[in-house]
Amino acid sequence: MTTIKKTTQHAIATATKKISADSIIKNGNVLNVFDGSWSQQNIAIAGDKIVGIGDYHEAKHIIDATGKYIVPGFIDAHVHIESSNVTPQEMARILLLNGVTSIVTDPHEIANVAGVDGIRFMIKEGEKSQLDTYFMLPSSVPAVSFEHAGAILKAADLKPLYQEKTVIGLAEVMDYPAVFSGEEDMIQKITDALVSGGHVDGHGAGLTAEQVEIYMAAGIRTDHESTTEDEARARMLAGMNVFIREGTITRDTLNVIGAVTPLNSRRFSFCTDDKLISDLMTEGSINYSVKLAIEAGIAPEIAYQMASLNAAEAHQLTEIGAIAAGYQADIVILDSIEKVKIDTVIKRGQVVVVDGERDEALFNQQKATFKSPKIEQQVKKNDLVLPLVTGKVNVIGIQPNHVETDHLHLQVTPDNGEFKTDYQQDIVKMVVVERHHGTGCVGVGLVKGFELKEGAFATTVAHDSHNIVAVGTSDEAILKAIAHVTDIGGGIAMIDGNLSVLADLPLPIAGLLSDQPYEIVNDQLKGLHTAFESISTARGFDPMLTLSFLTLPVIPALKLTDQGYYDFYSAAFIQVEQSK
């Protein structure tokens, strides 16, 4: 007899009360996300499924939820695990503690370094975790054709991966020129996703309402890049599922939530996109988004629906997202609806969090191993020289807690015909070094906003191609930072003015992920922040994550690649020194 048949027979026998349930949650106030109503009910669970809601009393295990509130497990509709710097197994430990029982992830960070091998590694690690981890295949590796990433993934490379049971579609399509022009390989990627029974996620940063219509015509059905109510509303009106983002840098919830109404709320879900482990530990994940939405005036019933059923249906996941017979037993028991205070988390019928504490005995972590590509770079001091004549320069202006940048036009004073740090205007040198193929490509630019007093810092986390990016007040400090992250096999390093290493975070898995428990990673990140505060006066934003997005050319306005400045709006490379 097949496992599915046995499971079905067991579920029916339990639902008809011929046998006792494995577990019953009794006397709780249960949210029906289909109509937003609450009712005091008992929930019967058999194996990993809910088999009935109502008059059930006999079970091997009773959970008393008197005075508590019961909602479906939360779903993160779009997340890059790599941005947490931990493996999928470690991600599961922190997310389940926050009531997140399923995630939909795009492994395009590791794919940009290690190609298909990187994707398969993440799928394998996801299967080891207690979390349900669904994968969308990276659509744009590299993000745009001119990027020097560690891999180039064509439609033919991705197609075999649709055979993996946890792969459910094509991830955020960010190469909008390829879509608009009908570029052959991009259209093939979209076609393969749809033919496989999957769906296609969008990445519509800066797209107009008319351009959103083009995305819809191409079969792209979701977007997580809305930063204003108007952008979110335009996508919703076009028929898109809108994922409202609350990450470490991209904190869009309060700017977007006003677009949600009782009549259109079923088109909205929540996502984190990119969130550091430190923020996952202090704020939470989707539970934090729900809390923000409720505080902003969204009815709790709608907020919890957005965090569960809406996300599940947007991703065509028909067995999660609700507390109903036949659905997977992914359940969160709350002490408070408004504060989203979590008491118990049940994953596939098993209690994994009780009294707000994780049951560590259930988390048998297996050490992740991955043969990372060697870092190939030979940057020299001469590569960092930035000649100037007039001193009229283009400068990247960081926007704290945003991935967009300002394109600044400033005047600096050349020092013997080249740029030297302008402390008064807070302008320092920024460098991107190609690390995958030993091309020798080095992009040099200028950035304002880090308020560095001395030293430098560097990281191999540099979206999306993940070359080495560094900023510093001297070429010597920049070179030291680059050399250190190379020596440790990838990671982040802080250097002081005396060229001493103040702190680091080794990321041996593709220069993106640690192989350590998330608590250790968090301590290392704290050390980096402390080190940064000793060489900078800037506060109120994450400097490492901010730096990592200054290299992403598919986000406005001015970015730096290993080939130089890229102007998003003109879609062209430009020089540091202005011609006029």
Where are the regions that the model predicts?
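Short coil/turn connectors at secondary-structure junctions
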Residues: I19-D22, H57-K60, T66, I70-P72, ...
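Histidine/acidic residue-rich metal-binding segments in metalloenzymes
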Residues: G118, I152-E172, A178-F243, T250-C271, ...
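Divalent-metal coordination cores built from histidine and acidic residues
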Residues: T2-A15, S20, A92-H199, L499-P506
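Active-site beta-loop-alpha junctions enriched in small/polar residues
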Residues: H80-E82, H108-I110, P138-A143, V173-Y176, ...
